[in-house]
Amino acid sequence: MKEDIPKDGEHKLQVPDTRPPAMFIADDPGLDFLNSIGTPAGTVIEWLANGEDLLAWLEQAKLIDSAIAAAIRANSFPGELDEVAAQARSLRERFREFVLTHMGRPLTAKALDVLEALNRVLERDEQYPAIVARPDLPRHRHARSGLELRSLRRWSTPNSLLLPLAQAMAHLVCYEDFSLVKGCEGKACVLLFLDRTHARVRRWCSMSICGNRAKQAAHRKRSPGKPESKPLKRAKRAAPINSRISP
């Protein structure tokens, strides 16, 4: 049975300079957000431990650019970004409960009743349409105009960082097939993904991580005469996070 993600403070998290890079393996930004905490090697890794982590993760996820990150950092009070990161973690775990409850089958309108917290974040958004120059990309070379209409956002406060996260989760809920949401079959892995394979046969967060471990385990079973290597210690079972966001 899989390990549950522990509550904040139940485990000593790895310090930033020893953490592996954040994992973007879900084929969906909303699920990638849920995967910003995980147990890739049996040890809890939190990639949103503080405000700087949040800015870095959003940039890596391409949900903000470096200019937005720099502007928000420059206009934040001490500790303000850390508070936003705590809200992001709370929103993440609230949405994780929803996904784990509904994954594997299509969503119905009844699910709306438990998405109120997400809607309360979305209603803070300050997006507006603007005419901007069209990027000079190959796919645009036959466009009739060098201009395009794009949705932009006013980043009024550090709390605005929650908006692209909420939008990514809302997109998953409204436009993706929840019957394709799966959890990695690795024994200690809690990562989620959207199975976009043609035959819907994806099993692992990554073949190079959990897929390879499963291959090695299968090989050991087929070779009973060979001594097995001592398995790595796994994180102890802990209760799931039950934190809530306070919009």
Name these PLM-found stretches:
Residues 1-180, 228-247:
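Short helix-coil boundary/hinge micro-motifs
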